[in-house]
Structures are given as structure tokens and as C-alpha cells.
Amino acid sequence: MNVLEDKLKQKDIQQFRDDLISWFEREQRVLPWREDQDPYKVWVSEVMLQQTRVETVIPYFLRFVEQFPTVEALADADEEKVLKAWEGLGYYSRVRNLQSAVKEVKQEYGGIVPPDEKDFGGLKGVGPYTKGAVLSIAYNKPIPAVDGNVMRVMSRILSIWDDIAKPKTRTIFEDAIRAFISKEKPSEFNQGLMELGALICTPKSPSCLLCPVQQHCSAFEEGTERELPVKSKKKKPGIKTMAAIVLTDEDGQVYIHKRPSKGLLANLWEFPNLETQKGIKTEREQLIAFLENEYGIQADISDLQGVVEHVFTHLVWNISVFFGKVKQVSDTSKLKKVTKEELEQFAFPVSHQKIWKMAGEAAAISAAP
């Protein structure tokens, strides 16, 4: 008998299920993707909820499913419009993978999200968690859906001290959930675990006295709930120093640039920018040389207007922001010139939305009497 089997034998699993599910059915939050448990909408919500808080997701979800209400609508949509609808949520590979996957659903499965574990799990961007969450919630399949919330809850329930930052640890929790999950109500069970982790069994200050499964919790019994789960610390993100410029011409049109189709923030739009180096030249001087060499642009460039910081999981951008008026341009093939009204139609990463906001505030100040 392995350690997990020994821990499972000590639990009244049926009573745990009953206590968790009855609490969830009584206390669950009203969330828009729970209204009809449509497989497509559940799928969209689960993709949005990766790395993003529920409160942030709700308005994005409502706008997204209004604009793309069905598999077919999203499959047939122009990528620019999809990226614009996702603008601000970040982690844009999520929505690119989602659109690729729904195209396959439309083509291979007649627009119906496949209920089969192998079929759905084979779609682009569908990992073990998304597969378990969507199929259990929408199709009532008894499949584990193990994310950080669930690992935290179950590490405390079963007193599991394995490092949850290590990929191999996930299999321990998947095995545990297979033993625990209700075959009659897998949707309510998985959602109950997620809800418990979000509302009660929180990372730093769990509300153990309010917990519906407190009597089943080994960590509560041992007084170790604040020590679990074990999670090794990530490396500090690297720092990239950059300079960006909001360039306008004499008509007030703005120059923007599209990022490459692969890599970080692929296919999003941004203002001309470069990675700067410490040395003899100032950031402003480096920017002047970059505009000349890359685009053949000569411009009157302001002094430093401010700095925008944006934090990714693995990287921090520190962007020095400048404004400029184009005097001469010899090659605009790498840039797009748009009006300020047209600019609102393009999807920009959050960092460059902040830059544009900074430009708008500066213009408002200079225009003030």
C-alpha cells in the first residue's frame, strides 16, 4: 500500500463528498458561465480563468460571448477582432489556442464541443485541467480537474507535503481526486472544490471555522493548514529596459507597429520601441538612432515623459516613454499610420495601453487653458 492509499483509507470519502456538494449547492456564487453550463461557454470561462481572477473575468466573459456566442462565431471571426475582445486579459496564447481549437471543433465535430475525453483533450491548448473542468462541469464526466486551488485544498485535507510547483506532483492529486470524485455529481464535486479553494481554503488565511469539510481535514487536525501546500519559490523575473515613442505626424495621425506572429504578445499592436542598453548614449539618443535606422524616420522627440512598468510571469518591462512629431519619413512599410479614432480598433498589450493613456493625459494638459 502506498502513502496516498494509506491516507485515503483514513477518510470517510462518501461523507466528504456529501458535505462538500451540499455546501456548494447551498453557497455557490452566481456566475454567468454557471447559468446554463453550455459546454462552449464553460470552455471560454475556464480559459479566461487561467491566471486571472473571477472578478476581472466576468465583464470580459460577458462581452466575449455576446460578440462570439457560439463555436461557429468564434471559429469564423477575424483574429484582430478576437484579440481586441481579449485585450487587457493578457496571456494571449490562450485565446489564439482557443480559436484554433474551436475551428477544429467546427470542422471535425460539427460545432459540438466533443464530450469524449480523448477527442476534447486532443484539441489545441486543452491541458489536463481544462479537459477535466469542461467535461465534468458541462457533461458531468467524473474526471479530475486539478489546478492550484484544488492542490491547495487537497494537500490540506490529506496532509500531502510534496512540492506542488513540481509537475510530477500533479499526478498525486489527480489520483486522489479520482478516488474522491462523486460519480453521481462530478460537476458539483469539482466546482465545489474550486469554490472551496477560492472562498474558504485560501492561500494565506484559510477560514477553517467556516469550512464545510473541516472534520475531514488532516491539516486542521494537525494545526498545519498555514504550512500547506508546499510550494518552492520561482526565480525572480528578468528585467528588460526599453524605450517607446508615441509618434504623430502633422495631421495628428499615429504610427503603430505590429509584433511578430510568433513569440510574446504575438500579432498585437504597439508603439515603436526598442530594448535600450546602458552606456554612452542616452535612451533618447538610442531612440533617435533606432527610428532613423529601422524606419528612416527623423522626428522632434520630447524629453522623457514617464516610465511604464509591466510585469509578466518571467519578465519585467521597464519602458521609458517619449513623444515625437515626425519631420521626415522614407519607409513606412514596417509601420501603420492610423487616426486616433482608428487606433481604438486595434489590440494593444496592457503596457502600450498605459503608454497611450499617458499620451492622452499629456495632450489634455497641454490643451488646457
UniProtKB/Swiss-Prot annotation:
Q: What induces it?
A: Expressed during exponential growth. Expressed as both a monocistronic transcript and a mutY-fabL-sspE transcript.
Which residue ranges does the record assign to the HhH domain? 108-137
What's the domain of life for this entry? Bacteria
This protein's cofactor list reads: [4Fe-4S] cluster
Q: Which Gene3D superfamilies match?
A: Helix-hairpin-Helix base-excision DNA repair enzymes (C-terminal), Hypothetical protein, domain 2, Nucleoside Triphosphate Pyrophosphohydrolase
Query: What biological processes does GO assign it?
Result: base-excision repair; mismatch repair
**Entry's EC annotation:** 3.2.2.31
Catalytic residues in the record:
E46 (proton donor/acceptor)
Q: Which reaction does it catalyse?
A: Hydrolyzes free adenine bases from 7,8-dihydro-8-oxoguanine:adenine mismatched double-stranded DNA, leaving an apurinic site
The UniProt annotation places DNA binding at W33, R34, Q51, T52, L89, G90, Y91, Y129, T313
Offer an example of a GO molecular function term for this protein.
purine-specific mismatch base pair DNA N-glycosylase activity
Q: Where is this site: Transition state stabilizer?
A: D147
Look at the named UniProt entry and state the broad enzyme category this protein falls under: hydrolase
Pfam families hit by this protein? HhH-GPD, NUDIX_4
Q: How is the cofactor bound?
A: Binds 1 [4Fe-4S] cluster. The cluster has a structural role.
* Deletion consequences: Cells lacking this gene have a 100-fold increased spontaneous mutation frequency. A double mutM/mutY disruption has a 1000-fold increased spontaneous mutation frequency. Triple ytkD/mutM/mutY disrupted strains show increased mutation rates during exponential and stationary phase.
Positions bound to [4Fe-4S] cluster: C201, C208, C211, C217
Keywords carried by this UniProt record: 4Fe-4S, DNA damage, DNA repair, DNA-binding, Glycosidase, Hydrolase, Iron, Iron-sulfur, Metal-binding
Q: Which PANTHER family match?
A: ADENINE DNA GLYCOSYLASE (PTHR42944:SF1)
The function of this protein is: Base excision repair (BER) glycosylase that initiates repair of A:oxoG to C:G by removing the inappropriately paired adenine base from the DNA backbone, generating an abasic site product. 8-oxoguanine (oxoG) is a genotoxic DNA lesion resulting from oxidation of guanine; this residue is misread by replicative DNA polymerases, that insert adenine instead of cytosine opposite the oxidized damaged base. Shows a powerful dicrimination of A versus C, since it does not cleave cytosine in oxoG:C pairs.
Family per similarity comment? Belongs to the Nth/MutY family.
What this protein is called in its record is Adenine DNA glycosylase
Organism from which the protein derives: Bacillus subtilis (strain 168)
